[in-house]
Amino acid sequence: MADLLSVLQDKLSGKNVKIVLPEGEDERVLIAATQLQKTDYVSPIVLGNEDNIKSLASKHALDLTQIEIIDPATSELKDELVDAFVERRKGKATKEQAVELLDNVNYFGTMLVYTGKAEGLVSGAAHSTGDTVRPALQIIKTKPGVSRTSGIFFMIKGDEQYIFGDCAINPELDAQGLAEIAVESAKSAQSFGMDPKVAMLSFSTKGSAKSDDVTKVQEALKLAQEKAEADQLDHVVIDGEFQFDAAIVPSVAEKKAPGAKIQGDANVFVFPSLEAGNIGYKIAQRLGGYDAVGPVLQGLNSPVNDLSRGCSTEDVYNLSIITAAQALQ
């Protein structure tokens, strides 16, 4: 983790990227905000009831003098953001509905990003993934040419660094969806300084098993390779389908997939379903001892990232750094 953060911190030095932390009444978030404020990487904007935040700060002896605190219920920005929301959701939300929605810290924070008052958002310490992602999908929306957002995790232990996806967002994926996630994950890997070798995972290696699920991954591989070529991702390798051991162990790859472009040296893993991805990253985290940073959402016009409700202060800090780095891309 230290290597990734040090690379990102070098890129962020002096940038003071404005990142919204909507859950300012959560002590983990507030402590992380004070730590971030001491850097020149991130300038946090904390949302919540100001009295509650100040009481929490007093309890933990935190200095808030340099931190911007906004209470959505009383903010002078509320009317401006309501009007912008109604315009963005034209025909889908009345002004009265917008006023009510923007009392919600995640909607308010997402509108700060959409209107350019902030550059990214990190939430989820006290909210579900849906509560964090829904406003982003409605307001910020996906990039041109991208039909969905997806969630990747950086899996880090010592010098080892991998990307797992999709582990958080899409419960049902067809071949086209898997292909899109593979290409977006490759782009994410590149943007964080990795040389992407993307393995499309299955319970089959290079046709060793036959089923509709295997066929879906094989079709996704072909589509992903075509999309990568169309997007001119010249230095990206995408191959499959692989069982996990064939994707990560050279001696196994030599036996199961001789001649494959990836010979046990994959660093980006695209799981065939959300169940597999979510279970896989948690096994690596809990049994393998890997730090799991994320989910980092990809495919949006501006970065919005989702914490686990079991996150630590360190997780909030780290994901804020990653979000700031995304904002500069």
Swiss-Prot record:
| The keyword Transferase is assigned to this record | yes
Localisation per UniProt entry: Cytoplasm
The pathway it acts in is: Metabolic intermediate biosynthesis; acetyl-CoA biosynthesis; acetyl-CoA from acetate: step 2/2
The UniProt catalytic activity note for this protein reads: acetyl-CoA + phosphate = acetyl phosphate + CoA
Q: Which residues form the signal peptide?
A: none
Tell me where on the tree of life, at the top rank, the source sits: Bacteria
Any one cellular-component term (Gene Ontology): cytoplasm
**InterPro entries, per database record:** P_Ac_Bu_trans, P_AcTrfase, P_AcTrfase_dom1, P_AcTrfase_dom2, Phos_Acetyltrans/Butyryltrans, PTA_PTB
What EC number(s) does its UniProt record assign? 2.3.1.8
Which biological process, per GO, is one annotated for this protein? acetyl-CoA biosynthetic process
Q: Does the keyword Cytoplasm apply?
A: yes
What keywords sit in the KW lines?
A: Acyltransferase, Cytoplasm, Transferase
What one GO molecular function would you report for this record? phosphate acetyltransferase activity
Extract the Gene3D superfamilies matched here.
Answer: 3.40.50.10950, Isocitrate/Isopropylmalate dehydrogenase-like
Record family assignment: Belongs to the phosphate acetyltransferase and butyryltransferase family.
Q: What is this protein called?
A: Phosphate acetyltransferase
What is the organism field in this record? Answer: Staphylococcus epidermidis (strain ATCC 12228 / FDA PCI 1200)
Which taxonomic lineage is given here? Answer: Bacteria, Bacillati, Bacillota, Bacilli, Bacillales
